[in-house]
């Protein structure tokens, strides 16, 4: 398809550099630049904003973000094969793209941006690290976080877990952590054929906004409670949280011990954590 930013079509770029997506890195390349623009627009206004991107690959989404006016993109890429392609984008947008070769799970993202700078996180996350990265971004001790919003692509099943509420089959630890500190929504689905190679599942773009004042709670305690409760989700709470105090803890929190984890609201999980 024709380029929309003055750079060559992505398929041509990938072919010229002999790039193919590596399954071991959880890569799936997006070719459709109209689709990458749709993802970037979902994030909200980009003028004057620094964008953090993880796993840019050949830079389809990077190009969309820059073409929509982002002040700067800081992209963390583990695959050195992609660096020459990203260097071409960097040359096309002088001073607006910084590429860091490294492991996103070991990166201190907040340290990459000057304090007080408006930041949005936009990424087609590698499938094998996406969930852990999200949890890392959701659970800093200080809140509000350094980011204004997160617009992230996941496998659809993961997206459903992020936005799920109590009573939903997809509700679990991820839904509690996301629901505690953010307002999240599934923006739109992306079919397998949009990628190369096509994954076996549909993907979805999730948009998250931080809550100004989430309910006060110790991060570590909330993690302990959700891990215990959903670790044995089919059992009654008196059994699943037995290691944390069982019925004594539940009585203190005012929660019926015969209930199961998936019936508890985010607020009830926070109460439970605060009673530890």
Swiss-Prot record:
Pfam families xref list: RrnaAD (PF00398)
Keyword match Signal: no
UniProt subcellular location: Cytoplasm
Keyword field contains Cytoplasm: yes
Binding site for S-adenosyl-L-methionine: 28, 30, 55, 77, 103, 124
Keywords, ordered alphabetically: Cytoplasm, Methyltransferase, RNA-binding, rRNA processing, S-adenosyl-L-methionine, Transferase
Single GO molecular function: RNA binding
Record-level GO cellular component terms: cytosol
Family matches, as Gene3D superfamilies: Ribosomal RNA adenine dimethylase-like, domain 2, Vaccinia Virus protein VP39
EC annotation from Swiss-Prot or TrEMBL: 2.1.1.182
SUPFAM superfamilies cross-referenced by the UniProt entry: S-adenosyl-L-methionine-dependent methyltransferases
Reactions listed under catalytic activity: adenosine(1518)/adenosine(1519) in 16S rRNA + 4 S-adenosyl-L-methionine = N(6)-dimethyladenosine(1518)/N(6)-dimethyladenosine(1519) in 16S rRNA + 4 S-adenosyl-L-homocysteine + 4 H(+)
Domain of life: Bacteria
InterPro entries named in the record: KsgA/Erm (IPR001737), rRNA_Ade_diMease-like_C (IPR023165), rRNA_Ade_Mease_Trfase_CS (IPR020596), rRNA_Ade_methylase_Trfase_N (IPR020598), rRNA_adenine_dimethylase (IPR011530), SAM-dependent_MTases_sf (IPR029063)
Function: Specifically dimethylates two adjacent adenosines (A1518 and A1519) in the loop of a conserved hairpin near the 3'-end of 16S rRNA in the 30S particle. May play a critical role in biogenesis of 30S subunits.
PANTHER family cross-referenced by the UniProt entry: DIMETHYLADENOSINE TRANSFERASE, DIMETHYLADENOSINE TRANSFERASE-RELATED
UniProt record similarity statement: Belongs to the class I-like SAM-binding methyltransferase superfamily. rRNA adenine N(6)-methyltransferase family. RsmA subfamily.
Protein name: Ribosomal RNA small subunit methyltransferase A
Source organism: Agrobacterium fabrum (strain C58 / ATCC 33970) (Agrobacterium tumefaciens (strain C58))
Gene name tied to this protein: rsmA
């Amino acid at each position: 398809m024709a380029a929309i930013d003055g750079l060559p079509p992505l398929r041509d770029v990938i072919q010229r550099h002999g790039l193919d997506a590596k399954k071991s890195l959880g890569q799936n390349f997006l070719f459709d630049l109209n689709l990458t623009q749709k993802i970037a627009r979902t994030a909200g206004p980009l003028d004057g904003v620094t964008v953090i991107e993880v796993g840019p690959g050949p830079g389809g989404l990077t190009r969309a973000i820059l073409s929509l006016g982002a002040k700067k993109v800081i992209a963390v890429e583990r695959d050195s094969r992609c660096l020459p392609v990203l260097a071409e984008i960097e040359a096309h947008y002088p001073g607006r793209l910084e590429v860091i070769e490294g492991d996103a799970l070991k990166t201190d993202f907040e340290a990459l941006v000057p304090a007080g700078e408006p930041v949005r996180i936009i990424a087609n996350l590698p499938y094998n690290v996406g969930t852990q990265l999200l949890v890392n971004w959701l659970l800093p001790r200080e809140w509000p976080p350094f980011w204004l919003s997160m617009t992230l692509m996941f496998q659809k099943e993961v997206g459903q877990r992020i936005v799920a509420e109590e009573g939903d089959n997809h509700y679990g630890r991820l839904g509690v952590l996301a629901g505690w500190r953010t307002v999240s929504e599934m923006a739109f689905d992306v079919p397998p054929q949009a990628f190369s190679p096509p994954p076996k599942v549909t993907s979805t773009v999730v948009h998250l906004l931080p809550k100004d004042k989430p309910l006060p709670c110790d991060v570590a305690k909330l993690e302990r409670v959700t891990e215990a409760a959903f670790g044995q989700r089919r059992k009654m709470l008196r059994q699943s949280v037995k290691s944390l105090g069982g019925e004594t803890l539940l009585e203190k929190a005012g929660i019926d011990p015969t209930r199961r984890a998936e019936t508890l609201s985010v607020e009830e999980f926070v109460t439970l954590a605060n009673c530890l």
